[in-house]
Amino acid sequence: MAARKPGLIALFDVDGTLTAPRKEVTPEMLKFMKELRKVVTVGVVGGSDLVKISEQLGKTVTTDYDYCFSENGLVAHKDGKLIGTQSLKSFLGDEKLKEFINFTLHYIADLDIPIKRGTFIEFRSGMLNVSPIGRNCSQEERDEFEKYDKVHKIRQTMVSVLREKFAHLNLTFSIGGQISFDVFPQGWDKTYCLRYLEEFNEIHFFGDKTYKGGNDHEIYESERTAGHTVTSPEDTVKQCSDLFLGKDNGSS
């Protein structure tokens, strides 16, 4: 077996890269990642919290990979141990948070959209997730809202209003998924995790939303990474096989 290459890490987005969108990882992908880890250091970085990432990648996610970065790296694990945390609450303070949440809830209350459900704001340790329809809508309602939003630009308009109103807080607004958008301080995108990877001089990042506005864009564009756009978990396997495993290393 080839020794692991020092100074090199393969870093993966979760949703759409290691798993199909919002689905669990396949046994085939887990097996492939285990093989890959024999030749390179491997890390995962997802925008979701550790609970949601564990639902997709499995409960042993923090030990299955050398690095596990949840909430874009605001919660960081190395070799199964917590090595760093940052929180929105300690960064902004309760007064500013309350001001933002109150305004947002008033805005949603006045929104005239076909249906509303519940959980309009989800408070995570590193970000707020805002959903005009409410996160506990059904999959069917989620699909319908996505279509409605494409025409009526509900989220885009709301983000414009919030961006202007709270310009003094230096927040980033990232529209993703079907029904919501994320709100976090500038610089708290996936590049945040790179501060834990100073020992690596070659960082290969793999993600599917690498276009401008996508939540993989900043880390893909970073001068510290070699960015790779993937179209599916199968494409991830193919690109990594070509890059790291080669023909003579394909079996163990």
UniProtKB/Swiss-Prot annotation:
Which pathway, per its entry? Nucleotide-sugar biosynthesis; GDP-alpha-D-mannose biosynthesis; alpha-D-mannose 1-phosphate from D-fructose 6-phosphate: step 2/2
InterPro entries given in the database record: HAD-like_sf, HAD-SF_hydro_IIB, HAD_sf, PMM, PMM_cap
Q: Which GO terms describe its cellular component?
A: cytosol
Cofactors demanded by this protein: Mg(2+)
A GO BP term here is: GDP-mannose biosynthetic process
Query: Which CDD domains did the record assign?
Result: HAD_PMM
Q: What class of enzyme is it?
A: isomerase
Function field: Catalyzes the interconversion of mannose-6-phosphate to mannose-1-phosphate, the precursor for the synthesis of GDP-mannose. GDP-mannose is an essential sugar nucleotide for the synthesis of D-mannose-containing cell wall polysaccharides (galactomannans and glucomannans), glycolipids, glycoproteins and the antioxidant L-ascorbate.
This protein's name = Phosphomannomutase
A Pfam family for this UniProt protein?
A: PMM
Cell compartments where the protein resides = Cytoplasm
Residue numbers binding alpha-D-mannose 1-phosphate: 22, 124, 135, 142, 180, 182
Q: Which UniProt keywords apply?
A: Cytoplasm, Isomerase, Magnesium, Metal-binding
- The entry marks the following residues as binding Mg(2+) 2, namely 220, 225
Gene for this chain? PMM
Q: Which domain of life is it from?
A: Eukaryota
